[in-house]
Structure formats: structure tokens, C-alpha cells
């Protein structure tokens, strides 16, 4: 078998497409916007794992082109933020230089994929023409009260030397570098994402997204219905408010636990307990929220404040404790503890010998509890006028009763916290705020944007809580835009998520200097129809971009509320033994050599063939050999058939229509690995027919080439033209199948004797029952020894003879 010259074929058609674009802008066509999550310009470049998502999105984009749509398929660079800056620090080269070099390298590698990216739409988050509009969005949020300044303990990465949002802490560690996160009290800029919590949660049901991602976002937002209950303090006029989802258990609340940072702790702490309490507060301050929440129930710690609250229903005293498993920014920062019906409270009460009062029972009788009774329903006991009631029914009524009696109110609580938006680093968008002693915080006027990031010699993080920008006095010192008095610029920068929260809008209008996107183009080309990328940013980028889109909808910039109609998350490509590919592990597979040895088409196909696209898969270099053999076999089939003028037989037509049906069904279902295996299976069928008939008809070969084109575009274009196709394979239109043409003239029937298959009979499908039974007996011969008791024929399925 001759090997096709992949290098020559790819060069030939890339030059052809350069002169004859397959996806020219055409306003008359229906638009389809297919988008990759744009990459960080990493210094290590792309490996075969990165290729997977880009090949999937390009195959899907080319599919839409063949179906007659104008496809928006852009690419850009998420170049601000920690990944780029940390690499620059490691190399000892300014991030502006390393970023530019890395972009050039990755762009070269992306072009090896030969995806149909529209490079005229290219964006880079570090371009002042781009981040002018990132700053503009921040200013608009500031004007609407959604951006505000606050000093409080935040997640702090000692290695990256910057604050982190809650979403950037994974298992108590920095999601970028893996360092254990601590707490640091800092002045921060916040974005009030909590204002959008209900909408972010409710609108998930409108999205054609993987259920896994929607569930992750729903749990992160964490909406809970319940009541806020006010507990008066013994001997004081103050009160402490708690949030509970189970107001029906209020009679069983025997103690309160406050977050160590709760503002009432210092106020209510007795002199006798103060030293222990303050020591505990200091200890808790060094833990991240994730660490605090991860402690097992039996290992939880705490200190008694010496103060008591009064249960508003029964007047009983409730000791007030502090513990680091209660977080100041969750709910009210205080919880009422019902140890009889909460496993965590039960363990805490047992450890510190606190009272346990059962208020719900399965049968209405009190029992000695060895563990908390946590069933969703039961009969109320020890609950005054609520005794005998069903707890699940009382749950809603209890909230109403709390509100009616004046010591609480029905409310909704969220786990979602406001977004910590500032970073104490250099390589990011400057926050366009001026601090004036007279006017307070003042936004830089929009006509003065972009506020450009100044050049610095020392860009390494300071670790002091101030960014390197704080040391550039000529830049920091300015005049207030409002009153003209001396003022100082904000020196923190935006996080790496800022530009990525809206970049998908800019692609379609990337040269507009009057708007981040014109409303005309937003209405015409947006939102994104298909978004493809990893699941790792489910509660980061994907949540933030939804928030920003809703805000831009509210102020009239866009006419849609959700950025991405459909989302697909590809799995990771792993190295040998299922280990994640990384330079440090030495298991990175570069695509460069594979493209040289096998060609772009073979690598594209193997990226899809390696396994179900939504699942992780282990890379095996040997697998690409099989894909390459398939391409050679198909190429040779076309080469050998092209001049023979083979007339299509019924079987060729049947195979062709089944091929079209099966590939389309698998493609539309995103079963891309089975698409590739389908190509191999049907190619084998055609090779068998070619041996029998001397070749394959050109229409079947052209249809095969069109189906193959989204996946292996170069060889598909070559084979399409060898099969006498006109124009480009991408202008041929997606072939259609005919259900009737898919039916075979003959059927294969398993022949059974006493329920055991003895042979398979191939007969014309229109034979009568009598004819089929006669042929079946003839086929079985002496296998039918004995007395024939019964003949069974299930039409088109099976023949069975019962003999004795």
C-alpha cells in the first residue's frame, strides 16, 4: 500500500484555502458562533492535551460551514494575570517580553492544527485597546454601586504574594501554584456578584450545559430558605442574629457558635475568658476558609466566651461559643446549635459537655440519643405548643411564626460571597480609581481610559500587601478628576479573570474604539452558540462571565442575559499511567514531531479517536499509527477508483446512506471517538466492495470525503477532488441520507435448533415465511436430526426449530 504524502497534501490545500477562504464573511447566511476558551500564553507552549479541545471546536466549526452557515470562530490570548507573571519572574524577563514571545510560539502551534480561526478578530487582554473596555466595565459597576472597597481578612497566597478569591482556593491551596493559603487583613476591591445570586441560579435552567457544571454552580451559589432569628443577650440590650434553615427546631437550640471574627465577640467576652478567646482568634486567623470547613466534626475546636443568649421561644440560657468552623462571611457569622438534630452540633456538644434537647422523634417519644436524629421529618416533642406536629409541615410555618412574634424574619441566604477583585501584583489591568482625601474614591473619567499599566523595572510582588505599582510615585501621585486636589491612584490590579469575563464580546467588534461592542453587532452575532473548554473553571470564569454578561444586559450594552448557549467540556489527555501531562513530570508529548511524521490530519483524528471526548484519556503514541493507516487506505481507495467510472451498485448506495446516517448521528451527539471508528468501519466495507466490483463509485467517495472534512480537512479536500468534486469540499453541502436506501436487499437470520444457534442464513428480505423455512431446513441439513415438533419464525429476526 502506497503512503500518501501528507506534507505535500497539507501544503497544497493550505495554500489553496489561503487564496480561497472556506468561511468568508457572508451576511446572508445564518451565523454560528463557536468559541474555544482562549489560552494563557504559557512558556511551555502547547502539548497534545491542549490540541484536543481546539480540534473538537474546529471540527464542529467546519461542520457548520459545510451546513451552509457563516461561522464565527476566533482566537485570542488571556495574557494578564498570575500564570504569565509567574513565568516571567521564573525566567527573569519582563512579562511584556515573555508574553509576546509565548503568544508567537503558541500561535505558530495553533496554526499547525490548521483550524479555521479568523485571525482578523484576534484579541489580547494586555492590549490597552482591549483593557480600556475592561476598565470601562469596572467604572460602570462602580457607578452602579457594584464595585466597592472593603478591608477584611482575605485568602492570601504566600508564594504568589497576592490575595485570592474564594473560587481560587482549591482544597485549602492556591489553584495556580498549590501553596497552602493563609489569611491576611487587607484593603480590597470587591464586586457585588451577590446582587445577581438569584438570577445566576435561576437562569441555569435555560442553559444547554452539562448537568455537572450547572450543579457545581448551583451548589457554589448555595441558596437556602429559612429565617433569621434574634437571640437577646443575657444582661445586655444587644442581640445576636443567626440564620437557620430549620426554624422548626428552635426549641432545641441550646447554645450559639460565632465565627471568631464576629464583631460581637470582643464585646461580649468576659474578662475571665478573654485571654483564651483572643488566643483562639489569633490561631483561627491563620487558617483559610477551606481549611476551617474541612475539619472532621470530632476534631472541631472552640472557646466559651463566658456570655449567654436567651432562646426566644422557651427563655432558656444558651452559652455563646466561638469556633473556626463558623465563617464570618457565611450567613450572619453566627449559628444556633441544635445538637439533637445536627451531626456537627452533636459532636461539638458531646466534646464540650453542652446540653442536648431532642425536639423531633420518629414516633413522638423521647429517647437517649447515641447520635443526632437527622431524618427530614418526625413528630415534634419538647416544643411547647408545637408538640405533636409533623416537623416537615412545621418548617415553613415556623418561619412565619418567628416573624409574627417579632424576634426574626423569613429570609434567603446564599453561600456565594462577593468577588475579591483586586490583586497585589503588577501584571494586570490597573484599577481605574483615584483616592482623594476630599472626595473619597473617584473613578477615572471614561474619556481618559485606558489607564495604561506603567513600565517598571521591579515587577516582582512585594509581599507587603501593596502591588509593585505603589513604588512608582510619578504614576501614583495625580489630581482628583472631581475636585482637582492632590490624589493617589489605586495601585492594586485586576485579577486574571477580568478580561476573560467579557472577551467573547470583543471578538466580533475588535476594532471599535467607541464601544466594547456595538449593539448592532452584538444583536447580529451574539451570544456564543457553542463554547468548548475544560471543566476546571466551572465556578470561576464560567460564573464570572455570566455575572458580567447580566450586568452588561442591565445597562443596555447587549440584548441577551447569558453568554454561552451551549457548553461542552472536553476531558484531559493524560500521560502514561494516567498522570497529568506537565513539564515537571517529563511526560509532555509535543505535537510538533507528530505533525512532521504523520501530518496534521492524522493527529487531529487521533485526538478525537483516543476516547469519549468528555472523559479523560491516556495518550499512546502507537494509536496514531492506526489512524494514519486508515487515512492511507482511504486515499488509496480513492486513487484506485477515480478513473474507473464505477457504476453504483445497490450495496454501494446502501453503504453510502448508512455511512451518512451513522456519522451524522454520532457527530450531532458529540460521540466523536465513534465517528472516527465509524469512518474506519465503513472504509473497510468499501474496500470489500472494491475488491468485488473493481472499485467504488465516485459519488460515494465524494460523500465520504465531505463527512471526513471537518476532522481531516486536507486529505478530505484532496480525495474530494480526486473523486471529481467541484469547488471545495467545504462548499459541497452536508450529504443527506434516505431511510429506504439504507435498507438491505438481503437479511441475515440466525438459525436455532432448540434455542441454540447452529447457522446464519442470508436471504432476500421479501421471501415468504414458507420459502424462508424451506431454505433454513436446507441450510441446517443433518443438524435437524430428530422429530420436528415446532417451527418458529420471527420476521426479519430469527428462525427456531424445536426437535425431539
Q: What is each residue range found by the language model?
A:
Residues 1-20, 24-31, 259-262, 272-274, ...:
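Basic, alpha-helical terminal appendages of large translation-related enzymes
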Residues 307-330, 359, 476-613:
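Alpha-helical recognition segments enriched in aromatics with Gly/Pro capping
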Residues 78, 143-158, 223, 410-439, ...:
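Helix-rich, typically C-terminal accessory recognition domains appended to large enzymatic cores
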Residues 194, 199-222, 259, 263-303, ...:
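Amphipathic alpha-helical
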Residues 1-35, 65-74, 98-105, 209, ...:
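Conserved oxyanion/phosphate-binding beta-strand-loop segments in alpha/beta enzyme cores
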Amino acid at each position: 500500500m502506497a503512503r500518501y504524502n501528507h506534507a505535500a497534501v497539507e501544503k497544497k490545500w493550505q495554500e489553496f484555502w489561503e487564496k480561497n477562504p472556506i468561511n468568508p464573511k457572508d451576511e446572508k447566511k445564518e451565523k454560528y458562533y463557536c468559541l474555544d476558551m482562549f489560552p494563557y500564553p504559557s512558556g511551555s507552549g502547547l502539548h497534545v492535551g491542549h490540541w484536543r479541545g481546539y480540534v473538537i471546536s474546529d471540527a464542529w466549526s467546519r461542520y457548520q460551514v459545510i451546513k451552509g452557515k457563516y461561522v464565527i470562530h476566533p482566537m485570542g490570548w488571556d495574557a494578564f494575570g498570575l500564570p504569565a507573571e509567574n513565568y516571567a519572574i521564573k525566567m527573569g524577563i519582563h512579562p511584556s517580553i515573555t508574553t509576546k514571545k509565548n503568544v508567537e510560539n503558541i500561535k505558530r502551534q495553533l496554526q499547525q492544527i490548521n483550524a479555521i480561526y479568523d485571525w482578523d478578530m484576534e484579541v489580547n487582554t494586555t492590549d490597552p485597546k482591549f483593557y480600556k473596555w475592561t476598565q470601562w466595565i469596572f467604572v460602570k459597576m462602580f457607578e452602579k454601586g457594584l464595585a466597592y472597597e472593603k478591608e477584611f481578612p482575605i485568602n492570601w497566597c504566600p508564594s504568589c504574594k497576592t490575595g485570592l478569591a474564594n473560587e481560587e482556593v482549591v482544597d485549602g491551596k492556591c489553584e495556580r501554584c498549590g501553596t497552602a493559603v493563609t489569611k491576611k487583613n487587607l484593603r480590597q476591591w470587591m464586586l457585588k456578584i451577590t446582587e445577581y445570586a438569584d438570577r445566576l441560579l435561576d437562569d441555569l435552567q435555560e442553559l444547554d450545559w452539562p448537568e455537572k457544571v450547572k450543579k457545581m454552580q448551583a451548589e457554589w451559589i448555595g441558596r437556602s430558605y429559612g429565617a433569621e432569628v434574634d437571640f437577646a443577650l443575657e444582661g445586655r440590650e444587644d442581640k445576636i442574629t443567626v440564620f437557620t434553615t430549620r426554624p422548626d427546631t428552635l426549641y432545641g437550640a441550646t447554645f450559639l457558635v460565632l465565627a471568631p471574627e464576629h464583631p460581637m465577640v470582643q464585646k461580649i467576652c468576659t474578662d475571665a475568658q478573654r485571654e483564651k478567646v483572643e488566643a483562639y482568634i489569633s490561631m483561627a486567623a491563620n487558617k483559610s476558609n477551606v481549611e476551617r470547613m474541612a475539619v472532621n466534626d470530632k476534631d472541631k475546636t472552640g472557646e466559651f466566651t463566658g456570655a449567654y443568649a436567651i432562646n426566644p421561644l422557651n427563655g432558656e440560657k444558651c452559652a455563646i461559643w466561638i469556633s473556626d468552623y463558623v465563617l464570618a462571611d457565611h450567613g450572619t457569622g453566627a449559628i444556633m446549635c441544635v445538637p439533637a438534630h445536627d451531626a456537627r452540633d452533636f459532636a461539638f456538644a458531646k466534646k464540650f459537655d453542652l446540653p442536648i434537647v431532642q425536639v423531633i422523634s420518629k414516633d413522638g417519644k423521647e429517647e437517649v440519643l447515641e447520635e443526632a436524629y437527622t431524618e427530614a421529618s418526625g413528630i415534634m416533642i419538647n416544643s411547647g405548643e408545637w408538640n405533636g406536629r409533623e416537623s416537615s409541615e412545621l418548617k415553613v410555618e415556623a418561619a412565619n411564626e418567628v416573624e409574627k412574634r417579632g424576634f426574626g424574619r423569613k429570609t434567603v441566604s446564599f453561600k456565594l460571597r462577593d468577588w475579591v477583585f483586586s490583586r497585589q501584583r503588577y501584571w494586570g489591568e490597573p484599577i481605574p480609581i483615584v483616592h482623594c482625601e476630599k472626595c473619597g474614591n473617584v473613578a477615572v473619567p471614561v474619556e481618559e481610559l485606558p489607564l495604561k499599566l506603567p513600565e517598571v523595572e521591579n515587577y516582582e510582588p512585594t509581599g507587603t500587601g501593596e502591588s509593585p505599582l505603589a513604588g512608582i510615585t510619578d504614576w501614583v501621585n495625580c489630581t482628583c478628576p472631581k475636585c482637582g486636589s492632590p490624589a493617589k491612584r489605586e495601585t492594586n490590579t485586576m485579577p486574571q479573570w477580568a478580561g476573560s469575563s467579557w472577551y467573547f464580546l470583543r471578538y466580533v467588534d475588535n476594532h471599535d474604539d467607541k464601544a466594547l461592542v456595538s449593539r448592532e453587532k452584538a444583536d447580529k452575532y451574539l451570544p456564543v452558540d457553542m463554547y468548548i473548554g475544560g471543566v476546571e473553571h466551572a465556578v470561576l470564569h464560567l460564573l464570572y462571565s455570566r455575572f458580567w454578561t447580566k450586568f452588561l444586559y442591565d445597562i443596555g450594552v447587549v440584548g441577551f442575559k447569558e453568554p454561552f448557549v451551549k457548553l461542552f467540556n472536553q476531558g484531559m489527555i493524560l500521560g502514561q499511567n494516567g498522570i497529568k501531562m506537565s513539564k515537571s513530570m517529563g511526560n509532555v508529548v509535543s505535537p510538533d514531531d507528530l505533525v512532521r511524521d504523520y501530518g496534521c490530519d492524522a493527529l487531529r483524528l487521533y485526538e478525537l479517536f483516543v476516547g469519549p471526548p468528555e472523559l479523560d484519556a491516556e495518550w499512546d503514541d502507537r494509536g496514531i499509527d492506526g489512524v494514519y493507516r486508515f487515512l492511507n487506505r482511504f486515499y488509496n481507495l480513492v486513487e484506485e477508483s477515480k478513473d474507473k467510472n464505477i457504476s453504483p451498485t445497490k450495496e454501494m448506495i446502501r453503504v453510502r446512506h448508512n455511512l451518512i446516517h451513522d456519522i451524522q448521528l454520532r457527530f450531532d451527539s458529540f460521540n466523536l471517538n465513534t465517528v472516527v471508528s465509524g469512518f474506519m468501519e465503513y472504509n473497510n466495507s468499501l474496500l470489500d466492495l472494491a475488491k468485488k466490483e473493481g472499485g467504488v463509485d465516485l459519488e460515494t467517495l465524494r460523500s465520504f470525503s465531505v463527512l471526513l472534512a471537518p476532522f481531516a480537512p486536507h486529505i478530505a479536500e484532496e480525495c474530494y477532488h480526486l473523486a471529481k468534486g467541484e469547488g471545495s469540499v467545504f462548499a459541497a453541502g452536508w450529504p443527506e441520507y434516505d431511510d429506504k436506501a439504507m435498507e438491505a436487499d438481503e437479511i441475515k437470520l440466525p438459525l436455532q435448533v432448540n434455542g441454540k444457534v447452529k447457522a446464519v442464513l442470508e436471504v432476500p428480505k421479501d421471501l415468504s415465511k414458507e420459502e424462508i423455512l424451506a431454505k433454513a431446513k436446507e441450510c441446517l441439513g443433518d443438524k435437524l436430526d430428530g422429530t420436528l415438533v415446532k417451527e418458529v419464525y420471527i420476521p426479519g429476526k430469527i428462525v427456531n426449530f424445536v426437535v425431539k
